[in-house]
Amino acid sequence: MQDNVIIDTSIFTNPNIYKSISLEQPIDAIEAFIGLTHKSSKKIYMPRTVYIELCKVVDLESIKSRFESSIIIKSPNRCNITINALALFDFVEDMRIRINKGLRIAEEFARDKTQDIQNTISKLREKYKEALRQGTLDSKEDVDVILLALELNGVILSGDEGINSWADKFGIRTVNPLFIQEFLSF
């Protein structure tokens, strides 16, 4: 049976991951990944929203035709995919907890009488982002990766904690992206 593999931008933009493919820049890792796909029996998919996001982060102009010939750019059929109500319930509860945590962080920083406003704002942004976004689905691109994996009964190859956490909740197989080369060679 041939694996359908769904990828996201993290494998090309997270230095810890893309350096396992190529020691250079993200564009070099993408070119190396394209080479790996040609030797693999697996079908590689990327949701269109993720592709658009990748194009904003990395200039693909010089390799766009090879990328689109090697990786299937496909949106999930959002109209026909059914999501378990318990998953929605869990997501809303998780968001409520995160929002409350974010409010507590904001209150803590509002009470801080430090004179260095710029430093305080930077710390607030970092803690707030960590509280609200880390380990959960925090974008439509993340949701599309999950939905496409459900639709195609696929395997997710991502370094995003939120995607991997929610893939686990839905029973979707994930592969550690540090093992990209080995995974694609089987």
UniProtKB/Swiss-Prot annotation:
It is an enzyme of class 3 (hydrolase). GO terms for biological process: tRNA 5'-leader removal. The keyword Metal-binding does not apply. Belongs to the HARP family. This is RNA-free ribonuclease P. One of its GO terms (molecular function) is ribonuclease P activity. It catalyses: Endonucleolytic cleavage of RNA, removing 5'-extranucleotides from tRNA precursor. The lineage of its organism: Bacteria, Pseudomonadati, Aquificota, Aquificia, Aquificales. PANTHER family: RNA-FREE RIBONUCLEASE P (PTHR41173:SF1), UPF0278 PROTEIN TK1425 (PTHR41173). Pfam families: PIN_5. InterPro entries: PIN-like_dom_sf, RNA_free_RNase_P. It comes from Hydrogenobaculum sp. (strain Y04AAS1). Keywords: Endonuclease, Hydrolase, Nuclease, tRNA processing. RNA-free RNase P that catalyzes the removal of the 5'-leader sequence from pre-tRNA to produce the mature 5'-terminus. Its EC number is 3.1.26.5.
